[in-house]
């Protein structure tokens, strides 16, 4: 098998991808705007697994804590900006924030910055993260089949994340 000597992607490509569909999640809050899933499927009662988001690309921010300090806000802002940068393709992309601990709390003063954001909590022992939860903290791209395929470092360059995502959107026949 031929492997190119130079990779084009900025994020860490996960091989093999990690399935993200089968574990149980608990919905904390859902977007009121800027979500194609909400706009087209208002009949969804409660999301208890990522099966509901199947067929969508997802920019996911995964964290171990339930508070949103500056680093958290920066990463959530990154997911928002990257989604908006996709232009007409933004309705193919959802945003989510998942925590392993407690309920996520978004201060009322920050609500506008979090439009279009799904928030969930999950038990680390039921997820693919049970090996090393700290590794999974960060920004990820989840493909339309519900697999973690690319991870980004904290403080990632939004333009480079966008470039990776736009390549995936262009090449994808699903989602």
Predicted feature locations:
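Short active-site neighborhood of thiol/selenol oxidoreductases, capturing the structured segment around
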Residues: 46-80
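Residue-level signal for short, function-critical loop segments
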Residues: 63-65, 101, 145
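Short, internal strand/loop/helix patches
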Residues: 94-142
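Short, surface-exposed patches at the edges or C-terminal ends of soluble domains, predominantly
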Residues: 2, 80-85, 126, 163-175
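Thiol-/selenol-based redox modules, centered on thioredoxin-like
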Residues: 135, 141-175
């Amino acid at each position: 098998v031929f492997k190119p000597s130079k990779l084009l992607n900025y994020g860490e490509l996960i091989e093999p991808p990690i399935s993200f569909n089968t574990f149980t999640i608990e919905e904390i809050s859902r977007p009121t705007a800027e979500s194609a899933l909400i706009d087209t499927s208002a009949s969804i009662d409660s999301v208890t697994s990522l099966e509901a988001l199947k067929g969508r690309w997802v920019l996911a921010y995964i964290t171990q804590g339930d508070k949103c300090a500056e680093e958290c806000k920066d990463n959530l802002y990154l997911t928002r900006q990257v989604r908006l940068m996709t232009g007409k393709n933004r309705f193919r992309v959802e945003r989510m924030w998942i925590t392993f601990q407690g309920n996520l709390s978004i201060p009322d003063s920050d609500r506008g910055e979090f439009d279009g954001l799904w928030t969930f909590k999950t038990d680390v022992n039921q997820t693919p993260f049970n090996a090393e939860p700290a590794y999974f903290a960060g920004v990820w791209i989840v493909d339309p089949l519900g697999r973690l395929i690319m991870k980004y470092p904290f403080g990632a360059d939004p333009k480079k994340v966008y470039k990776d995502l736009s390549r995936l959107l262009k090449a994808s026949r699903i989602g």
